[in-house]
Amino acid sequence: MRLVLPALALLTSSVTGPVIAGTRQEGTVLMSSDPASLKIEEDWGFSDAIVAGDTIYLSGVVAGVREGETDLRLAYTRAFERIGEILKKAGSSWDDVVEITSFHTDLTTQMPAIVAVKKSYVKPPFPAWTAIQISRLIPTNGITEIKIVAKLRK
């Protein structure tokens, strides 16, 4: 019995170790091509997206209102465009999105604007979507953070 347990432990560690360790390798980690954004990603330790198998996991993209803006749709359009760029870089598109999670600083006032913009990018059949109320975001002008899960095109 003593020989079986160490052998089983060794077999288990050799099977799961490389699978877990190999998920985030060059080519599967997508970093920003914008120097300012890349610096933030490197300083804070995150990437634009990770490709794991046939699934793409995007980091949250923050929709931020610029000084003097009153139309929230402008902030959402910039965020959705950025998400589209990341999806394209990963070999995917809005048509391949399976899940959207959005974190809102004011759900009631923001929903009409995000829904209007989302309709321009997300077509039927629709992905799953969860919208969550939160107290604040970084940066301070952030109104909504949008997190995406998509599949690679076959």
Regions found by a protein language model. Give the residues of each.
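N-terminal presequence-like segments and the immediate start of the first folded domain
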Residues: 3-11, 17-98, 104-154
